[in-house]
Amino acid sequence: MSETAKKVIVGMSGGVDSSVSAWLLQQQGYQVEGLFMKNWEEDDGEEYCTAAADLADAQAVCDKLGIELHTVNFAAEYWDNVFELFLAEYKAGRTPNPDILCNKEIKFKAFLEFAAEDLGADYIATGHYVRRADVDGKSRLLRGLDSNKDQSYFLYTLSHEQIAKSLFPVGELEKPQVRKIAEDLGLVTAKKKDSTGICFIGERKFREFLGRYLPAQPGKIITVDGDEIGEHQGLMYHTLGQRKGLGIGGTKEGTEEPWYVVDKDVENNILIVAQGHEHPRLMSIGLIAQQLHWVDREPFTGTMRCTVKTRYRQTDIPCTVKALDDDRIEVIFDEPVAAVTPGQSAVFYNGEVCLGGGIIEQRLPLPV
C-alpha cells in the first residue's frame, strides 16, 4: 500500500484546526475519516450544550468534506485517568495541567488504540500546532511553525512510537492561514473561536466547579513577615504568582503595590503573600522535576544544557539539567524565574526539538 493510500482517523473536535487538518490530509491523498470523542458527561448543563454544538460542527465539516464521522465515548477513561488525578493534585495543594494529562491518557492512548484496533487506522491526526521529524529511525516532536500557537508543551509525554503513528497537518502552517483555508472552503468552523480554559469546565467559573468536587477549607492569608491580612476561601483556588481574586488591598504602613501569592503552607492551610511581582520569595533559581517522559524513551543520565518552559506561554529559559536518579532531575536556570509552580510541567527543548519533560515537584528558592 502506498503511504498516501493509508487510512488516517482525524480527531474532530468541532474546531477549525481539526477541520482544516482533515482537508489537508485529503489533499495529500490519505483515506480520511473523522472521530469525535466525548470525554465528559458528569453534568448535562452548559457543557452538554457545548459538546452537542461541537459534534454538530464536526458533523457539518465531515459532510462538507465527504468523509465519515465516527463517535466514541471516553468519559469513563477520562474520569479515571485524568479527572481523578486532577482533583488529587488540587487537594494536595498543587496546580495540575489537565490538558497534558488528557493528551497522554486520552488523545494519544485511548484514541490511538481505538483508531488502530476498531477502525483499522494506520495513523491518527490531530489539529495540534506541532511538527514531526524522523531522525535515525526515531520520530521527534518539533515545535509548531507558528510560535504563537506552538503546542509542543502539551505533548511532551508522547513517545517516539506514538509520534510515529500521528500526523499534525496544521503544524506546518500559521493560524491565519488555517482560518483562510477554512473560509475558502466554506467550513462552518472558519470563524469559530479557539477553545480556552479547561475542557470539562468550559466557560463556567472555576471556583464554583471545583467546589462541587472538593470541599473548600477557608484559612488565613499571611504576609511573608507573618502578619495576618485576610482570609482565603480554599488553597486550591490559588496558584503561585496569582494576584487577582485575593480580596486584599494595601496595608496601612505598606505600599499600594499589588499582592501576589508566593507560597502555600498546605499542612496549616495558610496562603502566603508578598507585594510586587518580582518579590524574592516568588523567584526560583531552579526546580526538581519527577515523573519524567523523554520523547526518545532513553534514560537520562549525567547533565545537559538546554532550554526549559515552566508554563505554556513562556519564553525559553536557558538551563542546566542534572539527573538525580532514574525519575528525578534538578534544573538550574541561568537567571532566576518567577512563579515556578509545583504540579505544573517543566518541558525541555534543544532548539526546535521538544526533548520531553516532567512534573515540577518543588522549586528551588533564591538563597536568602
Swiss-Prot record:
Pfam families per record: tRNA_Me_trans (PF03054), tRNA_Me_trans_C (PF20258), tRNA_Me_trans_M (PF20259)
Active-site feature positions: 102, 199
SUPFAM superfamilies: Adenine nucleotide alpha hydrolases-like
Enzyme class: transferase
Annotated binding of ATP, by residue: 11-18, 37, 127
EC identifiers of the protein: 2.8.1.13
Subcellular location(s) of the protein: Cytoplasm
Annotated GO biological process: tRNA wobble position uridine thiolation
NCBIfam families hit by this protein: PRK00143.1, trmU
Subunit relationships: Interacts with TusE.
HAMAP family the UniProt entry points to: tRNA_thiouridyl_MnmA
Protein name stated in the entry: tRNA-specific 2-thiouridylase MnmA
Lineage: Bacteria, Pseudomonadati, Pseudomonadota, Gammaproteobacteria, Enterobacterales
